[in-house]
A protein has these predicted regions:
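Intracellular innate-immune signaling modules
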Residues: 1-353
Length: 353
């Protein structure tokens, strides 16, 4: 299964992650048997399902769960799917490619099998993820799109042709998307069914804190502090944010700091957490450079959020006065991540910052 399904990699988040554990949102798994249900009784199964949610909420994990269950023949087994997971950057390459070549990359050396797969497009299940990392614009002019899955096309045309069902209209699409990208994709999608991932509810947040700290006095104190901070506790609906809050508050407790004084608001929790990464991950920074690079990082993050610009280029780094030493350090800390196939393009690992 690993040969055909090499996507169970460990997601990298900021920090050393020694204390990280993944606690799935139980309700997300409950969606699996319902993802392709008709919108109304006697209706047709949707051919396009958009799974939307905040960054880190679990969209990619759900996509991987679909792939895993498909590999075990437990996801709509009666459909005889042939499923493929694509990160949008795989589709949106700088060189022209055809959809059949994309499939061949997943199953190298199996041209006969690829031909057999493409002979039954109604059995294709395509999962598309990573729209926020696109470095080119989607095409919404139908006359510019293509029906031919054998034709070599620019990445933006190929992706837009798939999304619009101009190409492979019989195939079923599962699209993982953030709220901020919905308006970009919506004009292309044909009768999409929307599924929103809500993240942890209150009881699941409490359970996560208890699993992280154990049923200890320290854990009770941290949980009580977090629950009193309405904004901070609401942000904990995102699983990875919940972990970061736990990790950051634990650091403060271990240093003997009073949480109310050291973390008076939600922003201070994240600032202290990010600052704590520098002593262990950026020993080559002097105090002055440390401060300058951290200010540059904050400038970059604020500018990105204000302008809804998720892919950052060389000019953005220069404007924030981040030099190569700083960029390398932030890559090492997993605060920034280089986009695959794009030497000078980066994204924040977690947009919650």
């Amino acid at each position: 299964m690993e040969k055909f399904f090499p996507i169970w990699d460990i997601t990298t988040w900021p920090g050393n992650q020694r204390d990280f554990f993944y606690q799935g949102v139980h309700r997300h798994e409950e969606y699996l048997p319902c993802l392709l249900l008709p919108k109304r009784p006697q209706g047709r199964q949707p051919k396009t399902v958009a799974i939307q949610g905040a960054p880190g909420i679990g969209k990619t994990i759900l996509a991987k769960k679909v792939m895993f269950e498909w590999a075990r023949n437990k996801f709509y087994a009666h459909k005889r799917w042939c499923a493929f997971y694509f990160h949008c950057q795989e589709v949106n390459q700088t060189t022209d490619q055809s959809f059949s070549e994309l499939i061949e990359q997943k199953w190298p050396g199996s041209q006969d099998l690829v031909s057999k797969i493409m002979s039954k497009p109604d059995q294709l299940l395509l999962l598309l993820d990573g729209f926020e990392e696109l470095t080119s614009t989607l095409i919404d002019r139908l006359e510019d799109l293509s029906e031919d899955w054998r034709q070599k096309l620019p990445g933006s045309v190929l992706l837009s042709s798939l999304l619009s069902k101009t190409m492979l209209p019989e195939a079923t699409l599962l699209i993982m998307i953030r709220f901020t990208s919905w308006q970009t994709c919506k004009p292309l999608l044909k009768c999409p069914s929307l599924v929103t991932l809500p993240g942890f509810n209150t009881m699941e947040k409490i359970k996560y804190f208890q699993m992280y700290f154990g049923h200890t006095e320290e854990g009770d104190q941290v949980l009580s502090f977090a629950m009193e901070n309405t904004i901070l506790f609401s942000m904990c609906r995102v699983p990875v944010v919940c972990w970061m809050v736990c990790s950051g508050l634990k650091q403060q407790m271990e240093r003997g700091n009073n949480l109310t004084q050291s973390c008076p608001n939600a922003t201070s929790v994240f600032v202290r957490y990010i600052s704590s990464l520098f002593p262990t991950r950026a020993e080559n920074f002097s105090r002055k450079i440390h401060q300058a690079q951290l200010e540059g990082l904050c400038h970059l993050a604020a500018d990105s959020m204000w302008h809804r610009k998720w892919v950052l280029g060389k000019e953005d780094l220069e404007e924030a006065k981040l030099d190569q030493t700083g960029v390398t350090a932030f890559l090492g800390m997993s605060i920034l991540r280089r986009i695959a196939g794009e030497e000078d393009h980066y994204v924040f690992t977690l947009v919650t910052f």
